[in-house]
Amino acid sequence: MKLRTKAKALRGRLRVPGDKSISHRAVIFGAIAEGQTVIHGLLRGQDVLATIQAFRDLGVTIYESADSLIIEGRGFKGLKPAQKPLDMGNSGTSMRLLAGLLAAQDFSVQLFGDDSLSRRPMDRITIPLSLMGAELSGQGEKELPPLIVKGCQGLRPIHYQLPVASAQVKSAILLAALQTQGETVILEKELTRNHTEEMIEQFGGKLSVAGKQISIKGPQRLQGQTLQIPGDLSSAAFWLAAGLIVPGSDLVLENVGINPTRTGLLEVIEKMGGQLSYQAVDKDIQTATLKVSYSTLKGIEISGDLIPRLIDELPVIALLATQAQGTTYIRDAQELRVKETDRIQAVTDVLGQMGADIQATEDGMVIRGKTPLHGAAVSTCGDHRIGMMTAIAALLVEEGQVTLERAEAILTSYPDFFKDLERLWHD
């Protein structure tokens, strides 16, 4: 695919699609709650569609209305054995959260995915779930997919310290614990996104959170709800970056989720000197309208407990760093190596081929700016965030063409990405 280059300015207002993390969880909790759940603003990207289809295969009635998704919840005990293996597509969230949920059922199921997902480690969930008494088996030492889950209704509670900062692992344990007699305690290494904890309470469940410790007693019953999904900050990140680095740009992004466990990017933008302002802040539903303008940026260090709060935004932050004066250091981000692709290597390869002064390290990157970018032939590596980062980088290119292979990966989380780019384009 040939990407747009030589952007003069991006201007306008935009509503980004619904939050991917929250959309997954809304579907999951709607399916296991009792009664009807109505979801407005759901992301209809390929990852979330994989979660929806999985629950249909598990006997849950899910249908669309004009502007919402309606789920006829079956409760924890109402799921039915799937007649075939469940296809998770490219979605690590789907596989890990469903593994936790299905570990406590009374039937077995196989979860599989595409080539990218089949290279992602599942031992991080099989270890704690096995300690609870579940039987899960993958391929090799890292328990790579396909993953066989042999349900066990007699799971036992555990006290577990997460070895990695992972909301997916935490969520898998919580979904199993909701069906387990007794109290399960999870101690996080670093605070991670808390959408699962919030949704448990939203659906009438109970848990307690004290700093990095989460305690939950099971079994519990959940009740169907009506939900409004906020816009995805991880999708908004690409437009925020474009507004900051394309000269003459001025963008307003409406209804963006600003859950504090996800707003590391906004803090980084401010530290780099970006012109960012908040409008129409709604603290109850944690959304805001964000306004950005072209800015002179400076290099900074990004590390420590900030990393889990912006892990998905690090590719586009690396792009920002190529246009910042000075050196940016990204550290403690080794988790990037086990995403849809090795994002440290992919970001370094793509931006390096386009002329950036960027170096991969074991746990991050070193980027020296400011550098002009030029045309190149690159690939998404099957990773939606690499694809969108490249499309924004291409806007700065004045010489040569940028061609992007496997651009369809962007459909994973942002089906209308290129349509929205055209809406904001100003000659």
From Swiss-Prot:
Its EC number is 2.5.1.19. Phosphoenolpyruvate binds at residues 20, 92, 120, 168, 343, 385. It catalyses: 3-phosphoshikimate + phosphoenolpyruvate = 5-O-(1-carboxyvinyl)-3-phosphoshikimate + phosphate. InterPro entries: Enolpyruvate_Tfrase_dom, Enolpyruvate_Tfrase_sf, EPSP_synthase, EPSP_synthase_CS, RNA3'P_cycl/enolpyr_Trfase_a/b. One of its GO terms (biological process) is amino acid biosynthetic process. Catalyzes the transfer of the enolpyruvyl moiety of phosphoenolpyruvate (PEP) to the 5-hydroxyl of shikimate-3-phosphate (S3P) to produce enolpyruvyl shikimate-3-phosphate and inorganic phosphate. This is 3-phosphoshikimate 1-carboxyvinyltransferase. The gene is aroA.
